Amino acid sequence: MRSVRQIALVSCTVLVLTSVLWQQSIPESSQLDASLAAVLHKNHFTGRVQYSLQRRLGRSLNLELANLGRLLWFDTITGLNNDNTCGGCHSPTNGFGDTQSIAIGIENNGVVGPDRRGPRNMRRTPTVANSAFFPNLMWNSRFASLSGNPFDNSSGLRFPQPEGLTLSYLPHLLVAQAFIPPTERTEVAGFEFSGDNDAIRAEVLRRLNSISAYRTLFGQVFPEVHTGTSINFDMFGRAIAEFEFSLIFADAPLDRFARGDRNAMTAPQKRGALLFFGRAGCVSCHSVAGQSNEMFSDFKDHVAGTPQIAPRTTNNNFDGPQANEDFGLEEITGNPADRYKFRSSPLRNLSLQPAFFHNGSFSRLEDALRYHLNPREHAKHYSPAQQDLDSDLLGPTGPIEPVLQRLDPRLKQGTPLTPGEFDDLLAFLRQSLLDSRALPENLRSLVPPSVPSGRPVLQFQFTKKKRRTR
């Protein structure tokens, strides 16, 4: 009888304690929700940017045109070197970003994924997912809408020479940017064709116009082609851009929380969000308001103190006396004050990347974050080998001291976090900004089994596998 009473007493005690703890958790959870909601409101984050695309385009998506762009995206007919496509570097296996630390363009082995081989370019390929909302493009911001709005060409669309401002008549920055990749020697064009950019484009068009299947597809969305007009590069650019417009993946847990679903995020993710928008200071560069379009970038160029790595085999010319540096924005402006500056990376779907920073010098998000919180301290200990980079990237690193001397003032003092705070911030970055529609298994169907040219489609490695050294 006594043991029964003891059991009953213990049970009652457990119930009381559970009730007390549960009641205490309600205010804590509610306070966390209220704090995060207030912070998002202050930063003008609505979680609704994905719904604004058609309004800003002034029309609905043209699905036929987007599908044409998809076929072009994966067809090597658009590259004069005959071995790479847009999809070879902007891969659906990684959220339409790179599969590599530093991109591999021409002279590749026909594989897109961890086993891709070939000479390296200079930087990691940025994602095109959500790029419809980016006011400038590329790590050195070399393609930009001068109005700060990619949907507004009224102030001009700025490109390096020889294009300059000549593409400003096109309706969106992405339509204009589509004129460039076919002309990039190290990406798809190769070095055998001797003509200039216009001549390269003319040759791509000659190829497309010679394929009846492409003329039929273009004719379905451009009636003038159906009646005999040749395919032109405006049409090509519109098709590529329309496919990119379809790649909007901006419905992450944080978006759903902002729209009212308080259960969309875990408590650690919410605490991490408060750090991101608050004491950790991340939002000062990875901003969401105004022309940032909730993309987690101010789209400005900064010196982040990134370690300098260069591949053993490259088809690019690296900077510096030892050809192991990347001068970044200076390449475009010619101003030494812009040396080592790179555009703040948009952070949506960050966890789908296999590597981080402009040169993929980190293969693990937690290491990239730890470094970024205190570059001066962690630069002393950086080693490519510790990041499991491919063996062709394990050579001596470029000089770091001149990079640190130019470090953005916001990064000079470092940001101290407790281990728990670090884990919370990492959880926010890894999980709260990820739209599950961008996961590889949900994008696999976008790779066509065949393309109108009849050429073989590159081999995409959708199954996650361990990185192999070269």
Summary of predicted features, one role per range:
Residues 1-3:
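N-terminal secretory signal peptides that target proteins for export/translocation
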